[in-house]
Swiss-Prot record:
Pathway: Cofactor biosynthesis; thiamine diphosphate biosynthesis. GO terms for biological process: thiamine biosynthetic process; thiamine diphosphate biosynthetic process; thiazole biosynthetic process; tRNA 4-thiouridine biosynthesis. The gene is thiI. It is found in: Cytoplasm. Its EC number is 2.8.1.4. Keywords: ATP-binding, Cytoplasm, Disulfide bond, Nucleotide-binding, Redox-active center, RNA-binding, Thiamine biosynthesis, Transferase, tRNA-binding. Disulfide bonds join C344-C456. It comes from the Bacteria. It comes from Histophilus somni (strain 129Pt). This is tRNA sulfurtransferase. It catalyses: [ThiI sulfur-carrier protein]-S-sulfanyl-L-cysteine + a uridine in tRNA + 2 reduced [2Fe-2S]-[ferredoxin] + ATP + H(+) = [ThiI sulfur-carrier protein]-L-cysteine + a 4-thiouridine in tRNA + 2 oxidized [2Fe-2S]-[ferredoxin] + AMP + diphosphate; [ThiS sulfur-carrier protein]-C-terminal Gly-Gly-AMP + S-sulfanyl-L-cysteinyl-[cysteine desulfurase] + AH2 = [ThiS sulfur-carrier protein]-C-terminal-Gly-aminoethanethioate + L-cysteinyl-[cysteine desulfurase] + A + AMP + 2 H(+).
Length: 484
């Protein structure tokens, strides 16, 4: 099984030294991601493409899915490589592969060629296309908008019949740009802004300001873990949790109501700047969009930036909410975001849209900054890969079982895509499909006389969700530890 990885076009127009560095980094990223799932994978870089091979044909769907999420890949071709001697050899091998595909359809042949041959690419297209047209009576050549395009790459003494073309996410390889710290709340905006910086080549770390207790933190961890695993699993990143409940309490007690929103955001960027400086991170990322809420006017954003000691990046600054939600749906964070409460917007009933610097500074003079310092000093730092281990400790009270009783119902909480790829089948067992992001709104609708055993592939999300449901008062939840 072989894939040809085509690079993001902006990589190709870089200087030779920069392009080589980017390709080297992308090659390493691909290897890091794929080797976790398939130890037979070999990744080889070339001047203008990267070659990926695997001996495990059963991993095809998984590898296609993983490659489609790695930043730096514009698209990739699934190819079948065969040796040839003459142009007629290429035709015969192509015929055996595509004859059934072009029956009763229009088709054309497109050839790309490298190396020395006694024929041109156009000669090959005409010869192979003419041969297919004669061999398959019901097929018809049509050069413009055919039903089937037969694509062949010829390189030296080998031909590669392109079985499929898959789109990548583009962007730059992670590690080609400097690290950033994303202020993630679990909502639509922060998840999308994190993804956009990942796609642009930065390693994105996550900073979460907890305003809503353990349940809120669990939800945000789910989103951060989802984004990391899906799009940046090639790199280690940090998840930083800062308890901001006392900071909010101090603001509510001492700051004028209309100024609370801006003051809270200023406290957040102050804290995030300290975290960024500690780890040598160059910028912090927020999901703010111009005019979306009262604190996001140009005047207010300028005042927020003045409190930061790091560069503040806002990749969504010109995006509409509709665009943001569409992107969240595309990257798989929409449903998680739907279940997240918005805390920042509710602390002020009459927020100012045009804050005055002198007024903000006066209100902040009433604030006890030792509260902020304490919050930063007591921040929790976690390797995002350790979320699984931390979850095991947090959900010790949730039963993990291997043997099911008559009253147990398996709740498969994987995403629909995961279920389609690898359906869960246990003879004689009742299985309900309910993606993890729907549990908060739909679990109560289930028959509560039953015990529900949560299942996911690696057990991380099932344990997080079990803890979440326990905190909501549902005691009839367990975790499926192993399928025998």
């Amino acid at each position: 099984m072989k894939f040809i990885i085509k690079l993001f076009p902006e990589i190709m127009i870089k200087s030779e030294s920069v392009r080589k560095r980017f390709v080297k980094i992308l090659t390493g990223n691909i290897r890091n991601v794929l080797n976790k799932y398939d130890d037979t994978v070999a990744v080889v870089k070339h001047w203008d493409y990267i070659e990926v091979r695997s001996k495990n044909i059963e991993n095809r769907i998984l590898l296609v899915e993983l490659l489609g999420r790695i930043p730096g890949i514009h698209h990739f071709l699934e190819v079948e490589e065969k040796p040839f001697v003459t142009l007629h050899d290429i035709f015969e091998q192509t015929l055996s592969d595509v004859a059934t595909q072009i029956e009763n359809k229009t088709f054309c042949v497109r050839v790309k060629r490298k190396g020395k041959h006694d024929f041109s690419s156009l000669d090959a297209e005409r010869y192979i296309g003419g041969g297919l047209n004669q061999a398959v009576a019901s097929a018809k050549v049509q050069l413009s908008k055919p039903d089937v395009t037969v694509r062949i790459d010829i390189e030296n003494d080998k031909m590669m019949l392109i079985k499929a073309r898959h789109q990548g996410i583009g962007g730059y390889p992670i590690g080609t740009q400097e690290d950033v710290l994303s202020l993630i709340s679990g909502g639509f905006d922060s998840g999308v802004s994190s993804y956009m910086l990942i796609r642009r080549g930065s390693r994105v770390h996550y900073c979460f300001f907890n305003l809503g207790g353990a349940t809120h933190e669990i939800g945000v961890k789910q989103m951060a873990y989802h984004i990391w695993k899906r799009f940046s699993g090639s790199h280690k990143v940090r998840f930083v949790a800062i308890n901001f409940e006392q900071v909010v309490a101090e603001i509510l007690e001492k700051v004028d109501n209309g100024q609370m929103g801006v003051v809270l955001k200023r406290m957040m960027v102050r804290a995030a700047s300290k975290v960024a400086q500690r780890f040598g991170i160059q910028a912090i990322v927020t999901g703010e969009a111009l005019g979306q809420v009262s604190s996001q006017t140009l005047t207010n954003l300028r005042l927020i930036d003045e409190a930061a000691e790091s560069l503040v990046l806002r990749p969504l600054i010109t995006h509409d909410k509709e665009q943001i939600i569409a992107k969240a749906k595309e990257i798989g964070t929409e449903d998680i975001a739907k279940s997240m409460p918005e805390f920042c917007g509710v602390i002020s009933k009459s927020p100012t849209v045009k804050a005055v610097k002198e007024k903000i500074e006066q209100e902040e003079s009433y604030f006890d900054f030792s509260v902020l310092e304490s919050a930063v000093q007591n921040a929790q730092y976690l390797d995002i890969r350790q979320i699984a281990e931390q979850t095991k400790k947090e959900v010790f009270e949730v039963d993990e079982i291997t043997v099911l009783s008559a009253n147990d119902v398996i709740l498969d909480i994987r995403s629909p895509e995961e279920v389609d790829d690898k359906p869960l089948e246990i003879s004689g067992q009742n299985i309900i499909l309910m993606p993890f992001y729907k549990l908060s709104s739909h679990f109560a609708e289930l028959d509560q006389s039953k015990n529900y055993v949560l299942y996911c592939e690696r057990g991380v999300m099932s344990k997080l969700q079990a803890l979440y449901l326990r905190e909501k008062g549902f005691d009839n939840v367990k975790v499926l530890n192993k399928i025998s």
